């Protein structure tokens, strides 16, 4: 059997070898190594376009890997401490949906927090599983949902012992971590699978100075966004599984929706990034930690802002904190996170990850430099000096957990009618409403629309939040479920 080591990058190496050959392409893609689209070559470069190729015997096939892709997946599994890894070219959206579709069928129950990414609820629409939502605690100052509390999960398991799986966000977008190991043990004792949306935790496994990773905690499946903090290209992801999962069945689930024309640009970026993390991840992410902690100290020294960290840990709803997440509460200077987000981009040419009602997130990773941090800190100080106000008109960014009336699948496929936001109060929602990013639904199909929720949506619109999910692009109307006539 061929011995693999982390210095190798099988897909990348095969592409380099292919480029050295004078192969005449009579296959797709039709740009024929860029000759048919010179503007594309000008944009991306000859080397990039030259390896945008189709599956062929020397390059293996993502749908049924037997050579270099299989080797790359084995190396990824070894690097992340998993039994098996799948290279995913549909983003972590496809990884999250594969986890749910692999463990739940129509009518099955799944225990999960309500503040999941829309991809998880979309998976419930697809498979017909029934969500059992855990009530989330909210930090009263910064207004963000916290982690899963063990007692509440234990109660859900007691009330729904037939649930098939538990889905955990860890870490959250803001850096909040639950008691992942304790929750995993609790679920396994009840015979349930543990699925972890680790989209924002590709870096956790590579240093003991960060919270525990999903695989290290014993989870059954984990969706890892390599492109977020691991250095690969946008839309590339890795799905990790433990020993209890059947990798061939999971592959069949992946192939239900995954493209049969897998991008070798995406796959090679995963391959190279995995090698980088395996060889240099520890030193890289410890540098990221230093940059993040420096930025946090400097921002808090400005006054008005609150860059939070491990002081949030209470052992109940916050059991650890990912300090690489530079999450900053902004309402102390009288501005919403959305407003600060827009000012940073429009006035200072600084693009951060997102802004919500009360917070911003600056994503710090392996590509950041100290001079970039200094520029961000300086801009935030300037924004406070030039734009701060009393903030009396602000509403709290408190997370609102809607009442579930119908399953997401039943609601999504029900007859619907369009109402204005104000007229929709009391109705059952038939579509998604969310700020993006982060892509956590304010409303999802099957949930009761309340006055508080409508007020939140209208306030977010007024402050410039990018709302999506509704059929109406302006989000002045919302589709609700038509009531059945007797």
Residue ranges and their predicted role:
Residues 49-94:
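Conserved N-terminal alpha-helix of the aminotransferase class I/II PLP-enzyme fold
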Residues 466-486:
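Charge-dense polyanion-binding interfaces
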């Amino acid at each position: 059997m061929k011995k693999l080591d982390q210095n190798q990058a099988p897909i990348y190496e095969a592409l380099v070898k292919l480029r050295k050959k004078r192969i005449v392409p009579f296959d797709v893609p039709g740009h024929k190594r860029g000759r048919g689209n010179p503007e594309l070559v000008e944009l991306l470069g000859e080397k990039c376009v030259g390896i945008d190729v189709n599956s062929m015997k020397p390059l293996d096939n993502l749908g049924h890997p037997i050579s270099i892709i299989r080797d790359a997946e084995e190396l990824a599994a070894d690097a992340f401490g998993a039994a098996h890894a799948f290279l995913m070219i549909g983003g972590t959206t496809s990884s999250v949906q594969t986890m749910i579709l692999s463990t739940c069928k129509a009518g099955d129950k799944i225990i999960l927090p309500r503040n999941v990414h829309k991809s998880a609820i979309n998976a419930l629409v697809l498979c017909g599983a029934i969500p059992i939502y855990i009530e989330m605690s909210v930090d009263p100052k910064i207004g963000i949902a916290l982690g899963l509390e063990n007692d509440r999960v234990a109660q859900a398991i007691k009330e729904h012992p037939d649930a098939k799986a538990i889905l955990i966000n860890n870490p959250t977008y803001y850096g909040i971590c639950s008691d992942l190991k304790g929750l995993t043990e609790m679920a396994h004792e009840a015979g349930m699978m543990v699925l972890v949306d680790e989209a924002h935790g590709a870096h956790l496994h590579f240093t003991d100075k960060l919270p525990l990773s999903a695989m290290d905690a014993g989870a059954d499946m984990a969706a890892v966004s390599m492109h977020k903090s691991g250095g690969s290209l946008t839309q590339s992801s890795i799905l990790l599984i433990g020993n209890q999962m059947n990798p061939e069945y999971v592959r069949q689930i992946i192939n239900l929706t995954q493209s049969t024309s897998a991008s070798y640009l995406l796959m090679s970026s995963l391959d190279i990034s995995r090698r980088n993390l395996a060889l240099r991840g520890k030193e890289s992410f410890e540098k990221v930690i230093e940059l993040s902690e420096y930025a946090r100290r400097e921002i808090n020294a400005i006054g008005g802002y609150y860059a939070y960290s491990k002081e949030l840990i209470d052992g109940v709803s916050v059991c650890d904190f990912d300090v690489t997440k530079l999450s900053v509460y902004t309402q102390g200077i009288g501005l919403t996170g959305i407003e600060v987000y827009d000012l940073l981009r429009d006035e200072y040419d600084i693009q951060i990850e997102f802004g919500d009602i009360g917070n911003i997130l600056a994503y710090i990773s392996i590509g950041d430099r100290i001079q970039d941090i200094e520029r961000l800190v300086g801009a935030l100080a300037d924004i406070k000096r030039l734009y701060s106000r009393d903030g009396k008109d602000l509403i709290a960014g408190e997370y609102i957990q809607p009442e579930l009336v119908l399953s997401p699948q039943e609601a999504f496929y029900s007859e619907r009618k369009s109402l204005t936001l104000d007229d929709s109060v009391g109705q059952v929602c038939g579509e998604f409403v969310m700020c993006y990013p982060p892509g956590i639904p304010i409303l999802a199909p099957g949930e009761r629309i309340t006055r508080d929720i409508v007020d939140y949506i209208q306030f977010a619109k007024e402050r410039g939040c990018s709302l999506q999910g509704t059929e109406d692009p302006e989000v002045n109307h919302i589709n609700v479920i038509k009531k059945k006539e007797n």
